[in-house]
Amino acid sequence: MAEPSGVAPELLALRQHIDNVDRELLALLNRRAGLALEVGEIKKREGSVVFRPEREAQVIDGLKGTNPGPLKNDSVAPIWREIMSACRALETPTRVAYLGPAGTFSEEAALGYFGSSLVRLPCASIDEVMHAATSGAADFGVMPVENSTEGVVARSLDLFLTTPLFIIGETSLVVRHNLLRKVDELQGIEAICAHPQALAQCHRWLSHHLPDVERRPVASNAEGARLAGLNPALAAIASTRASSEYGLHVVSPAIQDDPHNRTRFAIVTHPSRHPAPKASGHDCTSLVVSVTNRPGAVHDMLVPLKNHGVSMTRFESRPARSGQWEYYFYIDVEGHPDEPKVDAALKELRAVCAFFKILGTYPIDVH
């Protein structure tokens, strides 16, 4: 492409260097893709899986550790995630189910974890995400499990009790809610459509700026954006991705009450299609347990972790549906069952529990 006249010679020279580097990068990327295809052929012969989250976590950690700059490590991870996603897609398409429609934070989490070279399968509910991953319609499901403002996603935790799926990864997003509308103004809004959690997370802003406007719960923020795209009297609370998807203006950005609002997602799959990840060196093990209702039972449950020096990073309780005032406890611990101290602690914990289920072991979020 011809450069405009009057451009400084130094700038022209630098642009030429950048063009040359880009061509070198393209050649190297294609060389990497060729090697990935060779790896894929070996995996097919051996019956191995294409996606290995612990391997990708180790690659990204290694690159961050040797990065000389000036490129920041926060940029290294998404760049290589897209490279690995594109190479993985050459071996086999990755089908990922998530809470839809297009433009949800669940879709953003799926793209952030797997990269953009995937087959997207938006679902109408969390239950449908689980069903898609269980039935084989999807290779993986993306499940919201916890929000820093609103707490746990109860339906997801309840489904983990009985599902055959297990967790092979996690990712989290900083959630920025925006007020979206077909018309770029606050006046004349009759109702605000959003997921109940989004409405709760923006309560103070809505009460201050739009106190008399109806708050209308819908299945997802993206569904609210879709409805707002059809009716200029409606507004939605959703992501900037949703604003682009449905042709809406960002009337007011970042209206969430907590500027550090973050949602955590679990990546789930079926054991018949994907083995549990091997130890990566920076792992988390999630489990759900229950104990008999007796004095000191919860204390006894935690003693094995303390005695073996296993750190607990999450502890949530959910009432059982037995009607007997019993509870399930959802626990995250640092480490992998292949580590002797973690293995010993989990064996002792299992012995004191009435119910014990490992939900998954996976690399700690590097995304």
Question: Where do the PLM segments sit?
Answer:
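Domain-level signature for soluble enzymes in the chorismate/prephenate branch of the shikimate pathway
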Residues: M1-H367
